[in-house]
């Protein structure tokens, strides 16, 4: 989210395709032409909000306006605000609940315009840009102490660890260790100050290392400017580093026994400031977190023991006190403390005494070593030596911990890119400022210089270099302040300080006075003022006054050789690890001072940051009381000024949000123009500049939204860039949709094919079981009973459960429930019928019932109305094993009895599906059914009283029962079996392409395989010959010869009767007797089905009967075999029509007729005898195409298929034009080709390929 100092600017780092609403630029349409759907998402800065979320949207740009906006948002718990890509954060001093997992997930994959300002948005941008553009990233967090820099750094680490993915155990271990560095380094490097309860007293640059997949594989930490002076002294109400209080309060018993750990009140270094606790912080729990972090990092128990041994040594070292002896020299007051410190450091106690009270001095003469003298120290000097040793041990211990963390975080794979997080304490202005504040403020000046170079100066320089029209903005360049501090020529503050230390190194007071004299040479610098005992530097954050006293001693930053000799004499290897350098007694070179080290570290930091793409977080401290809801306007206004927020806003408003070289721009966005790309390939043949212009033109970006530079294209607003990225994402989205559509089409095609195969299989074989059951019924009857015609139809199936007792819901379920039919019973058969019911005093009468046969019982169910409500109950339940005999007659009637022989009379039943009932009962009894068929039906009318019912065959069409006799009609012979199953009506196969499953031609889009398959030609259907508009169509009939009227010269009636009329013509001969109809096979037809007749092309068969469903029953003339044959495969042979008798001669002309003139009589006679001429051809109308040539050897269909018939075609034989269209198959082919063309055009219109 930062500005770029390079051609590949930071603004290019916006994610592509993240902002759906950002595409509403230009004409407000996506590349695909659809209106923007997620337009509301883009309204985050336009909807009603608290103030403005981006300071560049302020109507008035001033420090006061920025202050008012930040205050308004702060009072409504909106602590984050943008300045373009820079995030401004105000410390709320309380938990707002904005760092939960749900909030974190809401920022995944989003650009800053889609979501409210947040530190997670900065982290998302940095991670996305690193992963997408393969550029190193860094986040620079700046602000004064207590503004929230450390918290922001932790939240960035939290976000990156959450979204960086990677399920591998090593990657997860790396994430855990990175997160564990926070509590560990905070405990050793943070402390409570007056302004901040968790102030970082060191600078930290954490560099997270990632592989090519964006997964963390390692990390590296560089620390800067540890405030080691805090170890030995703090001002009132401040504390030492957290670890001392955690260790003193929460140390386990083994450390208390081994290291003599006591409460913090017992140690001078932790009790001098009279502050032992931090509100809201549990030091014991924090110590446990520190131990856990050490374990996660991988510190062994021995390493942890050594770390805490050094902490105990430092605490006990602070309790060493000195008093003046008789000579005025320092003497140790309590030797036991010295002995315990020696035990902890594992050195000799005498050496400790000597190192703390005596200084070894060596004289030299002519470059040679001279005498060595022991110089006693006074109490002040002894205390300084003691504190120097404590500070050196802690400083080196902290460096060792950082190095140990880096050792554990060493990358475990190839490192592709990194994200750096800089957390360093900010600008400090105290009542008394010394060398520490000078170093801190110097580093902040360097960071401010980076910000100016990368965001302000580089922006203007690039516009000038690219000849871009814009409004220049004046800004303060703090390079002069950095030069004032660090330059050697002319000498700066650090150079003067080093010179004073070198010339007057023995006496601190003299060195300070020498330093003051050197500062006089800087008086001409406008950013410097030298005053009595102090000097003032005009920093970007304000004027700071530094006290000179003690600066030279702090700058020396070297441990006395006596103390180095002391620690190197330790028998503890860990102590040697902390102090690895050997004392070189002959080295005369000046060791590097503290200012040299901080200068080198700052320059290294700047070089590191310049190699990465920066993002910025500017933190602001709202008040000095660490109080929530309190906003000190004057303090915040001061921070706004020294952070340069106003200049940043003005630069942002006047500049361009995105810039990129022409080649990179074209490489990224060439897909958006049809003139620069085709099917994903780059096709532009011109130069990259014209290609970039073409892309912007085709994407309809307004001209005021961009400018073309010398080598780059500049886009003014980020919304325009997000629109381009959204279009690019839409391109890939469309490609994915097309692939998905093709795949889904294929799946639907495959599914449709499978369904058709299944449907065909079920149609061919699904009813076989039912047919077998039907044929079994014939076997059970055994030719003993006449059959009804409907019973032996070819379409008859034994379906079984006709009432639907087994169905869920509906009347069948109601009947099952009312009859109490167990759910464990399998229903084999059910139907409605009648039962003969005898009533007292009345003759028996059939009554409706429902018969239900299960695998265990036969239920006779009755339905009665009781109190106007239908009551369903089982009238009789008969176990199937109790049925001894089933009695039926040998006639076609539907009556039968179930002979049970119990205490109840046997039921006499009437059921139209009796044969099916017998069959299912036979199978339920496993073939043990005793079916008795005879001339009478026997049943027990009363228990033990056998009765018979006579069956009389008469002319009754319907069975009837009366007075013990059943009347029925004649039936089919008893040996009758079911007819062959009739074939269904043949219909044209529905193509798989119907419903736009696929393009015509099959799944590959090529020629359809169906097209190459021979299609049988259907016989043309005779149609009436079309007539002209003047003549109404009449049914075609055989012409009857009529006498020709005599030709007369006049229509007047003659008065002569002398002429005799000719006798009437003889009647026509009677038609010949019709013979059997025959048909010729046009194609081969083969079938294994017994009900179908196989034929070969050219074979003549006899037509037995025709069905209206497209099948004819035919007989083979050679074998007399009969079967069904498809009508479309046959051509009926029409017997030749005999020649009609010649017309009778015309009657003799009357004698009274006048003589014809000029031989007209001969002409008339010739016309009468000559055959009539053929009908004239239809004239070829202008603009009408000539009819195509007729196909070879067309079969005469005796009807003209011409759509505009000629009335003269009464002979039944069409004209050449009609003959060409006589083939129905040809006409259908033409129609199908026309329909296919129409469908193809429609599909091409629908398809966006």
From Swiss-Prot:
Residue ranges annotated for the SH3 domain, each copy included: 1074-1135
Post-translational modification: Phosphorylation of the TEDS site (Ser-371) is required for the polarization of the actin cytoskeleton. Phosphorylation probably activates the myosin-I ATPase activity.
Gene3D superfamilies named among the record's database cross-references: 1.10.10.820, 1.20.5.4820, 1.20.58.530, Kinesin motor domain, Myosin VI head, motor domain, U50 subdomain, SH3 Domains
Polar residues bias: start-end ranges: 1199-1221
Keyword set includes Cytoplasm: yes
Region (Actin-binding): 418-500
Keyword entries, A-Z: Actin-binding, ATP-binding, Cytoplasm, Cytoskeleton, Hydrolase, Motor protein, Myosin, Nucleotide-binding, Phosphoprotein, Repeat, SH3 domain
Protein's name according to its UniProt entry: Myosin-1
Ranges of residues in domain IQ: 733-753, 754-779
InterPro entries, sorted: Kinesin_motor_dom_sf, Myo1_CA, Myosin_head_motor_dom-like, Myosin_TH1, MYSc_Myo1, P-loop_NTPase, SH3-like_dom_sf, SH3_domain
Domain TH1 positions: 787-979
Binding site for ATP: 143-150
Domain Myosin motor: 50-729
Reported function: Type-I myosin implicated in the organization of the actin cytoskeleton. Required for proper actin cytoskeleton polarization. At the cell cortex, assembles in patch-like structures together with proteins from the actin-polymerizing machinery and promotes actin assembly. Functions as actin nucleation-promoting factor (NPF) for the Arp2/3 complex. Plays an important role in polarized growth, spore germination, hyphal morphogenesis, and septal wall formation.
Any one cellular-component term (Gene Ontology): cytoplasm
Biased composition (Low complexity): 1026-1035, 1043-1061, 1150-1170, 1222-1235
Organism: Emericella nidulans (strain FGSC A4 / ATCC 38163 / CBS 112.46 / NRRL 194 / M139)
Localization (cell): Cytoplasm, Cytoskeleton, Actin patch
Disordered: annotated span: 1-40, 959-1081, 1127-1249
Quaternary data: Interacts (via IQ domains) with camA.
Keyword Secreted: no
Superkingdom assignment: Eukaryota
């Amino acid at each position: 989210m930062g500005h770029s100092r390079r051609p590949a600017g930071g603004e290019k780092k916006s994610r592509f395709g993240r902002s759906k609403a950002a595409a509403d630029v230009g004409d407000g349409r996506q590349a695909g032409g659809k209106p923007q759907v997620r337009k509301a998402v883009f309204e985050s800065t336009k909807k009603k909000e608290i103030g403005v979320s981006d300071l560049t949207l302020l109507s008035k740009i001033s420090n006061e306006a920025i202050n008012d906006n930040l205050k308004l948002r702060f009072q409504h718990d909106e602590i984050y605000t943008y300045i373009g890509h820079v995030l401004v954060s105000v410390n709320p001093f309380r938990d707002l609940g904005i760092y939960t997992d749900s909030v974190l997930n809401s920022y995944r994959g989003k650009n800053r315009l889609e979501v409210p300002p947040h530190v997670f948005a900065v982290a998302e941008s940095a991670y996305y840009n690193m992963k997408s553009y393969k550029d190193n990233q860094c986040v620079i967090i700046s602000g004064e102490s207590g503004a929230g820099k450390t918290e922001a750094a932790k939240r960035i680490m939290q976000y990156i660890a959450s979204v960086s993915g990677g399920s591998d155990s090593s990657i997860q271990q790396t994430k855990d260790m990175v997160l564990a560095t926070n509590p560990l380094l905070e405990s050793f490097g943070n402390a409570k100050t007056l302004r901040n309860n968790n102030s970082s007293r060191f600078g930290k640059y954490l560099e997270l290392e990632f592989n090519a997949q964006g997964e963390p594989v390692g990390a590296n930490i560089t620390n800067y400017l540890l405030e080691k002076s805090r170890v030995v002294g703090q001002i009132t109400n401040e504390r030492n580093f957290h670890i001392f209080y955690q260790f003193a309060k929460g140390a386990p018993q083994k450390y208390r026994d081994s290291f003599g750990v006591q409460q913090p009140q017992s140690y001078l270094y932790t009790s001098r400031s009279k502050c032992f606790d931090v509100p809201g912080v549990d030091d014991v729990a924090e110590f446990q977190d520190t131990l856990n972090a050490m374990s996660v990092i991988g510190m062994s128990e021995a390493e942890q023991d050594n770390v805490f041994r050094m902490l105990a040594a430092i605490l006990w070292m602070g309790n060493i006190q000195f008093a003046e002896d008789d000579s005025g020299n320092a003497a140790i007051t309590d030797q036991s403390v010295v002995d315990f410190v020696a035990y902890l450091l594992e050195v000799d106690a005498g050496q400790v005494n000597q190192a703390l009270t005596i200084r070894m001095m060596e004289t030299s003469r002519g470059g040679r070593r001279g005498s060595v003298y022991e110089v006693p120290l006074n109490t002040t000097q002894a205390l300084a030596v003691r504190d120097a040793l404590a500070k050196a041990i802690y400083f080196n211990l902290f460096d060792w911990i950082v190095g140990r963390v880096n050792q554990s975080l060493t990358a475990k794979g190839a490192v592709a890119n990194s994200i750096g997080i800089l957390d360093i304490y900010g600008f400090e202005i105290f009542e008394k400022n010394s060398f520490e504040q000078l170093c801190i403020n110097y580093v902040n000046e360097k960071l401010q210089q980076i910000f100016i170079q990368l965001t302000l100066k580089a922006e203007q320089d690039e516009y000038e270099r690219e000849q871009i029209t814009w409004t220049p903005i004046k800004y303060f360049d703090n390079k002069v302040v950095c030069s004032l501090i660090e330059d050697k020529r002319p000498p700066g503050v650090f150079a003067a300080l080093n010179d004073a230390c070198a010339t007057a190194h023995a006496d601190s007071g003299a060195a300070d006075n020498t330093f003051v004299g050197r500062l006089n040479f800087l008086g001409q610098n406008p950013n410097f003022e030298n005053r009595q005992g102090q000097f003032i530097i005009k920093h970007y954050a304000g004027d700071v006054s530094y006290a000179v006293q003690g600066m030279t001693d702090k700058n020396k930053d070297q441990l006395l050789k006596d103390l180095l000799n002391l620690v190197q004499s330790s028998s503890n290897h860990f102590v040697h690890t902390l102090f690895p350098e050997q004392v070189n007694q002959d080295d005369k070179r000046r060791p590097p001072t503290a200012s040299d080290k901080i200068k080198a570290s700052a320059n290294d930091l700047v070089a590191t940051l310049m190699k990465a793409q920066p993002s910025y977080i500017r933190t602001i401290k709202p008040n000095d009381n660490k109080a929530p809801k309190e906003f000190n306007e004057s303090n915040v206004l001061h921070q706004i000024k020294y952070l340069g927020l106003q200049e940043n806003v003005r630069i942002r408003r006047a500049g361009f949000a995105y810039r990129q070289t022409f080649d990179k721009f074209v490489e990224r966005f060439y897909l958006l123009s049809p003139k620069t790309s085709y099917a994903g390939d780059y096709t532009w043949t011109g130069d990259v500049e014209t290609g970039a212009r073409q892309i912007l033109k085709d994407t309809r970006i307004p001209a005021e939204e961009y400018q073309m530079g010398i080598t780059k294209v500049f886009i003014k607003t980020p919304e325009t860039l997000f629109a381009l990225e959204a279009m690019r994402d839409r391109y890939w989205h469309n490609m994915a949709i097309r692939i998905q559509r093709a795949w889904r089409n294929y799946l639907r095609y495959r599914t449709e094919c499978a369904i058709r195969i299944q449907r065909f299989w079920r149609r061919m074989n699904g009813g076989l079981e039912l047919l077998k059951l039907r044929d079994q019924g014939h076997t059970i009857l055994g030719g003993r009973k006449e059959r009804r015609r409907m019973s032996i139809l070819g379409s008859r199936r034994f379906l079984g459960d006709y009432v639907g007792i087994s169905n869920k819901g509906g009347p069948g379920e109601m009947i099952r429930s009312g009859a109490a039919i167990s759910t464990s019973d399998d229903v084999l058969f059910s139907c409605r019928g009648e039962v003969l019911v005898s009533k007292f005093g009345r003759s028996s009468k059939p009554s409706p019932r429902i018969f239900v046969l299960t695998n265990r019982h036969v239920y006779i169910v009755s339905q009665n109305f009781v109190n106007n409500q239908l009551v369903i109950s089982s009238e009789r339940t008969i176990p199937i094993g109790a049925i001894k005999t089933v009695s039926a007659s040998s006639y076609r009637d539907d009556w039968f009895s179930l002979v049970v022989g119990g205490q109840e009379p046997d039921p006499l039943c009437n059921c139209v599906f009796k044969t099916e009932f017998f069959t299912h009962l036979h199978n339920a009894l496993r073939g043990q059914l005793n079916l008795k068929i005879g001339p009478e039906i026997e049943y027990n009318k009363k228990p033990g009283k056998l009765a018979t019912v006579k069956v009389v065959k008469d002319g009754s069409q319907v069975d009837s029962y009366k007075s013990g006799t059943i009347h029925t009609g004649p039936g089919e012979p008893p040996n009758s079996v079911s007819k062959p199953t009739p074939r269904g009506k043949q219909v044209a196969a529905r193509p798989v392409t119907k419903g736009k499953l696929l393009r015509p031609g099959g799944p590959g889009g090529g020629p359809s395989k169906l097209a190459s398959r021979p299609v049988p030609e259907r016989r043309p259907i005779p149609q009436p010959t079309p007539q002209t508009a003047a003549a109404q169509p009449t049914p075609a009939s055989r012409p009857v010869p009529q006498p020709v009227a005599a030709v007369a010269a006049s229509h007047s009636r003659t008065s002569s009767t002398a002429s005799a009329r000719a006798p009437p013509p003889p009647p026509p001969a009677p038609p010949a007797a019709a013979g059997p109809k025959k048909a010729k096979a046009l194609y081969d037809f083969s079938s294994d089905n017994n009900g179908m007749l196989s034929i070969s092309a050219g074979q003549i068969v006899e037509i037995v009967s025709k069905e209206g469903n497209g099948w004819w029953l035919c007989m083979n003339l050679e074998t007399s075999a009969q079967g069904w044959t498809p009508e479309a495969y046959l051509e009926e042979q029409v017997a030749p029509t005999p020649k009609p008798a010649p017309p009778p001669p015309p009657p003799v002309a009357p004698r009274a007729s006048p003589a014809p003139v000029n031989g007209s009589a001969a002409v008339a006679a010739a016309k009468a005898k000559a055959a009539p001429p053929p009908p004239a051809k239809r004239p070829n109308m202008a603009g009408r195409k000539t009819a195509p040539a007729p196909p070879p050897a067309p079969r005469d269909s005796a009807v003209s298929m011409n759509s505009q018939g000629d009335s003269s075609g009464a002979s039944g034989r069409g004209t050449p034009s009609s003959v060409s269209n006589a083939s129905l198959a040809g006409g259908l082919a033409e129609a199908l080709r026309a329909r296919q063309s129409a469908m193809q055009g429609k599909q091409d219109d629908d398809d966006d390929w």
